[in-house]
Amino acid sequence: MIQQLKFLRRLSGLLFISGIVTSTFNTLRAQDKILMTRDFVYEEVFKTVLLYPALSGNNDELNTPIVPLTQNAPLILEFDELGEGSSNLYLKIIHCNADWTISTLSTVQYLDGYNETFIDDRKSSIGTRIPYTHYKVILPRVKVTGNYLAVVYRSSDESDLILTKRFIVYDSKVSIIPEQKPSTGINQRFTHQQLDFNILYPNMEIINPRGSVKVVIRQNKRWDKIIDDLEPLYIKEDIRKLEYNFFNLENNFPGGNEFRTFSTRSVKFNDINIDKISIQPDFAEVYLKRDVSTNNQAYALYPDIDGQFVVELYETKTKEVEPDYIFTNFTLDTKGLVPGRVFVVGAFNNYELSPESELLFDPETNTYRLKTLLKQGYYNYRYAFLPKGSRVSDEIFFEGSHFATQNVYDFIVYYRPPGARTDMVIGYKSININGRN
């Protein structure tokens, strides 16, 4: 912990030297940390958290951590700790209900063996200006389906939380048949995406589907973009079919826009959306090209990875310990103050509206600016607007929304039989909207 605090002070000094400081680095005491059953990082020196099934070896980190119970491919959790030292870290697994409250199942009901894994795979960064330790661990196999939380903590003290990360294990007991349709709303026809679907369950019995079945539809792997309160419009028990067709926009998502992108896979030249690179003895810094609002602009198709990011270097194939951490500068030209707060969001920061993701207004340039520390790679991002007095952000404010946007949707089906203590995951389906392969 002492080494960590020393590094934080040094890093804050680098932030001051390199320009605007928009956030402070904090290390909470163990007694001040509260377990969050969502993707969350409790200390700012821990960064670049990835959880994925190792399926092919080629950009596996883009794989969704939703896996079948019978899958042989391991789930991999990896992350970095900034600084020259390392910590003794442990992993445990928590089973959750469909609403992500902690279930009443005991550990022995969902896990074989002791629920504490020491993370012994740790490597120091090689040749980087900002040092870090890379951690990697294979998650233990679970015995039952459901929502799960991977929890990392320090030195066998479960209250000294480091990070939490969600994953799901399912059994394909039902078939999900989705169908994208034009929105039934006249005003939403060109801005929203409507998803009807049917659930077929020929090989199982479902009792009281309206009360026992829960479906979650998730946009672009985001837990802050879900619909989870749908009930079947028709229940056809004779053919074991649930029909989810609606006419009051219950199953409509704003299409949003394609994600903005940038690449720091090299600091030897200006890569995608990079305006300027500055190399100093102790750090490297990049400045993204100035962004503007794309609201009220016509839809334009360009490739993205649905909000995700990939750690990568052009000069080497080693992703874990050779990419450096780079001060990355975002600038949004709003032509003046806006009536609220401005954030940059993406999978790289769990779409968190936090001080670390907030852009501050710079009266000298009449723009909103943010400097943050990110590992080299290829990133997707958006700008989110938080109106004064609101707790709900609005990405359409800066990005616009189009029915033609290419998005990925997950359908997750839960079932709690009568008398059961928790929810089973009995089906999963992922689809790409508007033509992305």
PLM features: residue spans?
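Low-complexity, Pro/Ser/Thr- and charge-rich linker/hinge segments at domain boundaries
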Residues: 34-41, 169-192, 402-427
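Contiguous beta-strand segments within globular domains
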Residues: 42-93, 188-199, 315-330
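Long, internal scaffold/assembly segments composed of regular secondary structure
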Residues: 209-297
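Bacterial Sec-dependent N-terminal signal peptides
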Residues: 1-33
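Basic K/R-rich, polyanion-interacting modules in nucleoproteins and related proteins
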Residues: 287-338, 425-434
